[in-house]
Amino acid sequence: MLYALLLLFGGVSTVSSLRVAVVGEGVIGLSTATAILDLAEKRNIPAPEIHIFHHKPFEKILSRHIAGLFRIDSGSEIDRKYGYDTFEKLATLWREYGGLSGVQLVSGHILSDSKTKLDSQRESYGSLVYNYRDLAEPELFGPTSLFDLPRNTTTRGIHYTAYTSEGLRFCPFLKKELMTKGVRFTQRRIGNLEELGAEFDVVVNSAGLLGGVLAGDDAGNMKPIRGVLIRVDAPWQKHFLYRDFSTITIPVIDHVYMGTVKQEGAFGPNNVTSADIQDITSRYVALQPSFKRVHMLSSFVGYRPGRKQVRVEKQIRETNGSKKFTVVHNYGHSGNGFTLGYGSAVHAAHIVLDLPLDAYHGLVPEPLPINATISEWVKYLDD
Protein backbone atom coordinates (compact mmCIF):
# COMPACT_ATOMS: atom_id res chain seq x y z
CA MET A 1 0.00 0.00 0.00
CA LEU A 2 3.03 2.28 -0.19
CA TYR A 3 1.88 4.30 -3.21
CA ALA A 4 -1.63 4.73 -1.87
CA LEU A 5 -0.36 5.91 1.55
CA LEU A 6 2.18 8.31 0.08
CA LEU A 7 -0.47 9.74 -2.20
CA LEU A 8 -2.87 10.14 0.73
CA PHE A 9 -0.37 12.02 2.89
CA GLY A 10 1.09 14.08 0.09
CA GLY A 11 4.41 12.25 -0.12
CA VAL A 12 3.93 11.61 -3.84
CA SER A 13 2.35 14.17 -6.11
CA THR A 14 1.45 11.58 -8.77
CA VAL A 15 1.82 7.89 -9.39
CA SER A 16 2.53 8.54 -13.06
CA SER A 17 6.22 8.00 -12.33
CA LEU A 18 5.42 4.31 -11.77
CA ARG A 19 6.65 2.47 -14.87
CA VAL A 20 4.97 -0.84 -15.69
CA ALA A 21 6.07 -3.41 -18.27
CA VAL A 22 3.62 -6.09 -19.38
CA VAL A 23 4.99 -9.17 -21.14
CA GLY A 24 2.36 -10.61 -23.47
CA GLU A 25 -0.03 -9.12 -26.02
CA GLY A 26 -2.68 -11.82 -25.71
CA VAL A 27 -5.98 -11.38 -23.94
CA ILE A 28 -4.34 -11.61 -20.50
CA GLY A 29 -1.68 -8.97 -21.16
CA LEU A 30 -4.16 -6.62 -22.81
CA SER A 31 -6.71 -7.18 -20.05
CA THR A 32 -4.12 -6.52 -17.36
CA ALA A 33 -3.09 -3.21 -18.88
CA THR A 34 -6.77 -2.31 -19.28
CA ALA A 35 -7.56 -3.23 -15.68
CA ILE A 36 -4.63 -1.18 -14.35
CA LEU A 37 -5.92 1.92 -16.13
CA ASP A 38 -9.56 1.18 -15.20
CA LEU A 39 -8.65 0.77 -11.54
CA ALA A 40 -6.45 3.86 -11.46
CA GLU A 41 -9.32 5.91 -12.86
CA LYS A 42 -11.82 4.37 -10.44
CA ARG A 43 -9.60 5.10 -7.43
CA ASN A 44 -8.63 8.54 -8.73
CA ILE A 45 -4.97 7.55 -8.92
CA PRO A 46 -2.87 9.00 -11.75
CA ALA A 47 -2.26 6.27 -14.31
CA PRO A 48 1.18 4.67 -14.50
CA GLU A 49 3.15 4.48 -17.73
CA ILE A 50 2.57 1.09 -19.37
CA HIS A 51 4.68 -0.61 -22.03
CA ILE A 52 3.56 -3.97 -23.49
CA PHE A 53 6.15 -6.34 -24.97
CA HIS A 54 5.36 -9.25 -27.29
CA HIS A 55 7.63 -11.48 -29.35
CA LYS A 56 5.11 -12.77 -31.92
CA PRO A 57 2.81 -10.89 -34.29
CA PHE A 58 -0.81 -10.99 -33.17
CA GLU A 59 -1.80 -13.24 -36.10
CA LYS A 60 0.31 -16.08 -34.66
CA ILE A 61 -0.81 -16.08 -31.03
CA LEU A 62 -3.52 -18.19 -29.43
CA SER A 63 -5.79 -15.29 -28.45
CA ARG A 64 -6.26 -14.30 -32.10
CA HIS A 65 -8.18 -17.49 -32.85
CA ILE A 66 -10.47 -17.93 -29.82
CA ALA A 67 -14.28 -17.67 -29.85
CA GLY A 68 -14.37 -16.64 -26.20
CA LEU A 69 -17.69 -18.00 -24.92
CA PHE A 70 -18.14 -17.21 -21.23
CA ARG A 71 -18.08 -20.50 -19.31
CA ILE A 72 -16.16 -21.27 -16.12
CA ASP A 73 -14.50 -24.70 -16.04
CA SER A 74 -13.60 -24.69 -12.35
CA GLY A 75 -16.01 -23.90 -9.53
CA SER A 76 -13.27 -22.63 -7.21
CA GLU A 77 -14.06 -19.49 -5.25
CA ILE A 78 -11.30 -17.48 -6.88
CA ASP A 79 -12.41 -18.51 -10.38
CA ARG A 80 -15.97 -17.46 -9.60
CA LYS A 81 -14.63 -14.09 -8.42
CA TYR A 82 -12.56 -13.70 -11.60
CA GLY A 83 -15.54 -14.78 -13.70
CA TYR A 84 -17.86 -12.27 -12.03
CA ASP A 85 -15.45 -9.38 -12.68
CA THR A 86 -14.97 -10.45 -16.30
CA PHE A 87 -18.72 -10.78 -16.85
CA GLU A 88 -19.28 -7.30 -15.44
CA LYS A 89 -16.68 -5.89 -17.86
CA LEU A 90 -18.19 -7.72 -20.85
CA ALA A 91 -21.67 -6.47 -19.96
CA THR A 92 -20.33 -2.91 -19.77
CA LEU A 93 -18.63 -3.21 -23.16
CA TRP A 94 -21.75 -4.74 -24.71
CA ARG A 95 -23.95 -1.91 -23.47
CA GLU A 96 -21.54 0.80 -24.61
CA TYR A 97 -20.02 -0.59 -27.81
CA GLY A 98 -21.96 -3.70 -28.82
CA GLY A 99 -20.21 -5.80 -31.43
CA LEU A 100 -17.65 -3.08 -32.15
CA SER A 101 -15.83 -4.34 -29.06
CA GLY A 102 -15.88 -7.94 -30.26
CA VAL A 103 -18.40 -8.77 -27.54
CA GLN A 104 -21.60 -10.54 -28.58
CA LEU A 105 -24.65 -11.60 -26.55
CA VAL A 106 -25.54 -15.21 -27.34
CA SER A 107 -27.66 -18.03 -25.95
CA GLY A 108 -27.19 -21.74 -26.28
CA HIS A 109 -27.15 -25.23 -24.87
CA ILE A 110 -24.79 -27.72 -23.26
CA LEU A 111 -25.64 -31.43 -23.47
CA SER A 112 -24.04 -34.18 -21.42
CA ASP A 113 -24.64 -37.72 -20.20
CA SER A 114 -23.16 -36.69 -16.86
CA LYS A 115 -25.56 -35.06 -14.42
CA THR A 116 -22.56 -34.31 -12.18
CA LYS A 117 -20.90 -32.27 -14.93
CA LEU A 118 -24.07 -30.33 -15.64
CA ASP A 119 -24.65 -29.66 -11.95
CA SER A 120 -21.10 -28.31 -11.71
CA GLN A 121 -21.94 -25.77 -14.41
CA ARG A 122 -24.77 -24.42 -12.27
CA GLU A 123 -22.44 -24.20 -9.28
CA SER A 124 -19.68 -22.47 -11.24
CA TYR A 125 -21.66 -19.78 -13.04
CA GLY A 126 -25.40 -20.52 -13.05
CA SER A 127 -26.25 -17.54 -10.85
CA LEU A 128 -24.04 -15.19 -12.86
CA VAL A 129 -25.13 -15.67 -16.49
CA TYR A 130 -28.60 -14.88 -17.82
CA ASN A 131 -31.53 -17.31 -18.18
CA TYR A 132 -29.74 -20.35 -16.77
CA ARG A 133 -32.04 -23.38 -16.59
CA ASP A 134 -32.25 -27.11 -17.22
CA LEU A 135 -33.68 -28.17 -20.58
CA ALA A 136 -37.16 -29.66 -20.36
CA GLU A 137 -38.03 -33.04 -21.87
CA PRO A 138 -39.94 -31.53 -24.84
CA GLU A 139 -36.73 -29.68 -25.78
CA LEU A 140 -34.66 -32.86 -25.71
CA PHE A 141 -36.94 -35.64 -26.95
CA GLY A 142 -39.46 -36.10 -29.73
CA PRO A 143 -40.01 -34.89 -33.30
CA THR A 144 -40.65 -31.25 -32.30
CA SER A 145 -37.64 -31.08 -29.98
CA LEU A 146 -34.38 -29.25 -30.55
CA PHE A 147 -32.31 -32.43 -30.71
CA ASP A 148 -34.66 -35.41 -31.23
CA LEU A 149 -32.67 -37.53 -28.78
CA PRO A 150 -33.76 -41.15 -28.21
CA ARG A 151 -35.86 -41.43 -25.07
CA ASN A 152 -33.69 -44.18 -23.61
CA THR A 153 -30.63 -41.89 -23.48
CA THR A 154 -29.19 -40.45 -20.27
CA THR A 155 -28.42 -37.18 -22.02
CA ARG A 156 -29.66 -34.03 -20.33
CA GLY A 157 -28.94 -30.38 -21.00
CA ILE A 158 -28.81 -26.79 -19.82
CA HIS A 159 -29.54 -23.45 -21.44
CA TYR A 160 -28.06 -20.04 -20.67
CA THR A 161 -27.30 -16.65 -22.17
CA ALA A 162 -23.89 -14.99 -21.88
CA TYR A 163 -21.25 -13.22 -23.94
CA THR A 164 -18.62 -14.19 -26.45
CA SER A 165 -15.51 -12.05 -26.75
CA GLU A 166 -13.97 -13.21 -30.01
CA GLY A 167 -10.20 -12.76 -29.99
CA LEU A 168 -10.09 -11.62 -33.61
CA ARG A 169 -12.08 -8.50 -32.67
CA PHE A 170 -11.85 -8.21 -28.88
CA CYS A 171 -8.06 -8.06 -28.60
CA PRO A 172 -7.59 -5.39 -31.32
CA PHE A 173 -10.35 -3.38 -29.65
CA LEU A 174 -8.54 -3.49 -26.30
CA LYS A 175 -5.24 -2.61 -27.98
CA LYS A 176 -6.75 0.37 -29.78
CA GLU A 177 -8.26 1.65 -26.53
CA LEU A 178 -4.94 1.24 -24.74
CA MET A 179 -3.01 3.07 -27.45
CA THR A 180 -5.38 6.04 -27.20
CA LYS A 181 -4.43 6.18 -23.51
CA GLY A 182 -0.71 6.26 -24.22
CA VAL A 183 0.19 2.59 -23.76
CA ARG A 184 3.20 1.63 -25.89
CA PHE A 185 3.69 -1.68 -27.73
CA THR A 186 7.02 -3.21 -28.76
CA GLN A 187 7.72 -6.51 -30.52
CA ARG A 188 10.74 -7.88 -28.67
CA ARG A 189 11.60 -11.23 -27.17
CA ILE A 190 12.12 -11.01 -23.41
CA GLY A 191 14.60 -13.59 -22.15
CA ASN A 192 14.00 -13.06 -18.44
CA LEU A 193 12.08 -10.69 -16.20
CA GLU A 194 15.27 -9.13 -14.83
CA GLU A 195 15.91 -7.82 -18.33
CA LEU A 196 13.02 -5.39 -17.81
CA GLY A 197 13.57 -4.82 -14.10
CA ALA A 198 16.38 -2.37 -14.73
CA GLU A 199 14.04 -0.10 -16.69
CA PHE A 200 10.66 -0.61 -15.00
CA ASP A 201 9.33 -0.51 -11.45
CA VAL A 202 6.82 -3.32 -12.03
CA VAL A 203 7.01 -6.18 -14.53
CA VAL A 204 3.80 -8.13 -15.23
CA ASN A 205 4.30 -11.66 -16.52
CA SER A 206 1.35 -12.45 -18.81
CA ALA A 207 3.31 -14.72 -21.13
CA GLY A 208 0.69 -17.47 -21.34
CA LEU A 209 2.04 -20.97 -21.90
CA LEU A 210 5.61 -19.71 -21.50
CA GLY A 211 4.78 -17.74 -18.35
CA GLY A 212 6.29 -20.43 -16.13
CA VAL A 213 9.52 -20.49 -18.14
CA LEU A 214 9.78 -16.70 -18.03
CA ALA A 215 9.09 -16.73 -14.28
CA GLY A 216 12.08 -19.02 -13.84
CA ASP A 217 10.43 -20.99 -11.04
CA ASP A 218 7.27 -22.49 -12.54
CA ALA A 219 7.98 -24.12 -15.92
CA GLY A 220 7.27 -27.58 -14.53
CA ASN A 221 3.79 -26.55 -13.41
CA MET A 222 2.78 -25.64 -16.96
CA LYS A 223 1.65 -28.00 -19.70
CA PRO A 224 0.36 -27.42 -23.22
CA ILE A 225 -3.20 -28.46 -24.05
CA ARG A 226 -3.44 -28.82 -27.81
CA GLY A 227 -6.64 -27.53 -29.35
CA VAL A 228 -8.10 -27.15 -32.83
CA LEU A 229 -10.84 -24.81 -34.01
CA ILE A 230 -12.46 -24.71 -37.44
CA ARG A 231 -14.08 -21.50 -38.65
CA VAL A 232 -17.14 -22.24 -40.78
CA ASP A 233 -19.75 -20.35 -42.78
CA ALA A 234 -23.06 -21.08 -41.05
CA PRO A 235 -24.89 -17.75 -40.72
CA TRP A 236 -28.09 -19.48 -39.62
CA GLN A 237 -26.46 -20.87 -36.47
CA LYS A 238 -27.43 -18.36 -33.76
CA HIS A 239 -27.01 -20.51 -30.62
CA PHE A 240 -23.90 -22.13 -29.20
CA LEU A 241 -24.08 -25.90 -28.74
CA TYR A 242 -21.83 -28.13 -26.64
CA ARG A 243 -21.75 -31.89 -26.27
CA ASP A 244 -19.65 -32.86 -23.23
CA PHE A 245 -17.43 -29.77 -23.53
CA SER A 246 -15.32 -30.90 -26.49
CA THR A 247 -17.80 -31.13 -29.37
CA ILE A 248 -18.89 -27.54 -29.86
CA THR A 249 -20.04 -24.71 -32.07
CA ILE A 250 -19.89 -21.09 -30.98
CA PRO A 251 -21.41 -18.38 -33.21
CA VAL A 252 -19.70 -15.01 -33.12
CA ILE A 253 -20.46 -11.82 -35.01
CA ASP A 254 -20.08 -13.02 -38.59
CA HIS A 255 -19.13 -16.70 -38.55
CA VAL A 256 -19.16 -19.84 -36.40
CA TYR A 257 -16.37 -21.73 -34.65
CA MET A 258 -16.53 -25.53 -34.57
CA GLY A 259 -14.31 -27.74 -32.44
CA THR A 260 -12.44 -29.05 -30.65
CA VAL A 261 -9.77 -31.32 -29.21
CA LYS A 262 -8.23 -31.11 -25.74
CA GLN A 263 -4.96 -33.03 -25.90
CA GLU A 264 -3.22 -32.47 -22.57
CA GLY A 265 0.57 -32.55 -22.73
CA ALA A 266 0.66 -32.73 -26.54
CA PHE A 267 3.10 -30.42 -28.31
CA GLY A 268 2.44 -31.42 -31.88
CA PRO A 269 1.62 -31.61 -34.63
CA ASN A 270 1.77 -27.83 -35.04
CA ASN A 271 -0.62 -27.88 -37.97
CA VAL A 272 -4.25 -28.91 -38.34
CA THR A 273 -4.25 -32.43 -39.73
CA SER A 274 -6.82 -34.24 -41.83
CA ALA A 275 -7.36 -36.50 -38.82
CA ASP A 276 -8.21 -33.44 -36.70
CA ILE A 277 -10.75 -32.26 -39.27
CA GLN A 278 -12.31 -35.70 -39.62
CA ASP A 279 -12.52 -36.19 -35.86
CA ILE A 280 -14.15 -32.83 -35.14
CA THR A 281 -16.56 -32.78 -38.08
CA SER A 282 -17.74 -36.37 -37.59
CA ARG A 283 -18.48 -35.76 -33.91
CA TYR A 284 -20.28 -32.52 -34.58
CA VAL A 285 -22.29 -33.69 -37.58
CA ALA A 286 -23.58 -36.57 -35.44
CA LEU A 287 -24.85 -33.93 -33.02
CA GLN A 288 -26.22 -31.50 -35.62
CA PRO A 289 -26.53 -33.14 -39.07
CA SER A 290 -27.09 -29.84 -40.89
CA PHE A 291 -23.38 -29.07 -40.42
CA LYS A 292 -22.40 -31.61 -43.05
CA ARG A 293 -23.34 -28.87 -45.53
CA VAL A 294 -21.27 -26.01 -44.11
CA HIS A 295 -18.13 -24.62 -45.74
CA MET A 296 -14.86 -24.49 -43.84
CA LEU A 297 -13.29 -21.01 -43.97
CA SER A 298 -10.11 -21.66 -41.98
CA SER A 299 -8.67 -23.76 -39.18
CA PHE A 300 -6.20 -23.21 -36.39
CA VAL A 301 -4.16 -25.24 -33.93
CA GLY A 302 -3.07 -23.70 -30.64
CA TYR A 303 -1.85 -24.62 -27.19
CA ARG A 304 -3.81 -23.61 -24.11
CA PRO A 305 -1.62 -22.63 -21.11
CA GLY A 306 -2.49 -25.52 -18.82
CA ARG A 307 -1.94 -25.11 -15.07
CA LYS A 308 -3.75 -26.43 -11.99
CA GLN A 309 -4.70 -22.87 -11.04
CA VAL A 310 -4.24 -19.34 -12.36
CA ARG A 311 -1.09 -17.76 -10.97
CA VAL A 312 -1.62 -14.21 -9.70
CA GLU A 313 1.31 -13.61 -7.36
CA LYS A 314 3.70 -10.85 -6.33
CA GLN A 315 7.46 -11.21 -6.01
CA ILE A 316 10.21 -8.72 -5.19
CA ARG A 317 13.25 -9.35 -7.34
CA GLU A 318 16.62 -7.78 -7.93
CA THR A 319 18.53 -7.09 -11.14
CA ASN A 320 22.20 -7.89 -11.58
CA GLY A 321 22.80 -4.25 -10.78
CA SER A 322 21.02 -4.72 -7.45
CA LYS A 323 17.97 -2.66 -8.42
CA LYS A 324 14.84 -4.01 -6.76
CA PHE A 325 11.65 -4.29 -8.78
CA THR A 326 8.23 -5.91 -8.41
CA VAL A 327 7.05 -8.88 -10.46
CA VAL A 328 3.33 -9.60 -10.78
CA HIS A 329 2.48 -12.93 -12.38
CA ASN A 330 -0.81 -13.38 -14.23
CA TYR A 331 -0.85 -16.55 -16.34
CA GLY A 332 -1.96 -20.18 -16.38
CA HIS A 333 -5.62 -19.77 -17.37
CA SER A 334 -5.81 -23.11 -19.23
CA GLY A 335 -8.89 -22.93 -21.51
CA ASN A 336 -10.55 -20.08 -19.62
CA GLY A 337 -8.47 -17.07 -20.61
CA PHE A 338 -11.33 -15.05 -22.06
CA THR A 339 -13.66 -15.97 -19.18
CA LEU A 340 -11.28 -15.36 -16.28
CA GLY A 341 -8.86 -12.94 -17.94
CA TYR A 342 -10.23 -9.54 -16.99
CA GLY A 343 -11.07 -10.76 -13.48
CA SER A 344 -7.55 -12.03 -12.82
CA ALA A 345 -6.29 -8.79 -14.39
CA VAL A 346 -8.22 -6.76 -11.80
CA HIS A 347 -6.52 -8.83 -9.08
CA ALA A 348 -3.12 -8.23 -10.68
CA ALA A 349 -3.92 -4.52 -11.06
CA HIS A 350 -4.56 -4.22 -7.32
CA ILE A 351 -1.07 -5.62 -6.73
CA VAL A 352 0.55 -3.38 -9.36
CA LEU A 353 -1.03 -0.26 -7.85
CA ASP A 354 -0.32 -1.39 -4.27
CA LEU A 355 -4.00 -1.30 -3.32
CA PRO A 356 -5.70 -3.34 -0.57
CA LEU A 357 -6.50 -6.96 -1.43
CA ASP A 358 -9.42 -7.40 0.96
CA ALA A 359 -11.71 -8.67 -1.82
CA TYR A 360 -9.38 -11.65 -2.36
CA HIS A 361 -8.81 -12.70 1.25
CA GLY A 362 -9.83 -16.31 1.76
CA LEU A 363 -10.30 -16.90 -1.97
CA VAL A 364 -6.74 -17.27 -3.25
CA PRO A 365 -5.43 -20.86 -3.02
CA GLU A 366 -1.99 -21.73 -1.73
CA PRO A 367 0.71 -21.23 -4.39
CA LEU A 368 1.85 -24.33 -6.23
CA PRO A 369 5.27 -25.68 -5.19
CA ILE A 370 8.23 -24.25 -7.08
CA ASN A 371 8.99 -26.40 -10.12
CA ALA A 372 11.54 -24.98 -12.55
CA THR A 373 11.87 -28.16 -14.62
CA ILE A 374 12.04 -27.36 -18.33
CA SER A 375 9.99 -29.98 -20.15
CA GLU A 376 10.61 -31.18 -23.69
CA TRP A 377 7.65 -29.25 -25.09
CA VAL A 378 9.33 -25.90 -24.38
CA LYS A 379 11.94 -26.20 -27.13
CA TYR A 380 9.23 -27.11 -29.66
CA LEU A 381 6.74 -24.37 -28.78
CA ASP A 382 9.06 -21.50 -27.79
CA ASP A 383 9.31 -20.00 -31.26
Curated annotation (Swiss-Prot):
It is found in: Secreted. Its main location: secreted. InterPro entries: D-amino_acid_oxidase_CS, DAO, FAD-dep_OxRdtase. Glycans are attached at N152, N271, N320, N371. FAD binds at K56, S63, T339. One of its GO terms (molecular function) is FAD binding. Its EC number is 1.4.3.1. GO terms for cellular component: cytoplasm; extracellular region. It catalyses: D-aspartate + O2 + H2O = oxaloacetate + H2O2 + NH4(+); D-glutamate + O2 + H2O = H2O2 + 2-oxoglutarate + NH4(+). Keywords: FAD, Flavoprotein, Glycoprotein, Oxidoreductase, Secreted, Signal. It is an enzyme of class 1 (oxidoreductase). The keyword Nuclease does not apply. Disruption phenotype: Mutant worms have high D-Glu content at both egg and young adult stages and a high L-Trp level at young adult stage but do not show any change in physical appearance. They also have decreased egg-laying capacity at 20 degrees Celsius, and decreased hatching rate and smaller brood size at 25 degrees Celsius. Mutant worms also show delay in growth to adulthood and an extended life span. Impairs the nose-touch response. Does not decrease male fertility. In both sexes, present in coelomocytes (at protein level). Expressed in hypodermal cells and the proximal gonadal sheath cells in adult hermaphrodites (at protein level). Also expressed in probable head mesodermal cells and unidentified cells in the head, and vulval muscles in adult hermaphrodites. Expressed in the seminal vesicle, spicule and tail cells in adult males (at protein level). Selectively catalyzes the oxidative deamination of acidic amino acids. Plays a role in the egg-laying events and maturation processes of the reproductive organs. Belongs to the DAMOX/DASOX family. This is D-aspartate oxidase 3. The lineage of its organism: Eukaryota, Metazoa, Ecdysozoa, Nematoda, Chromadorea.
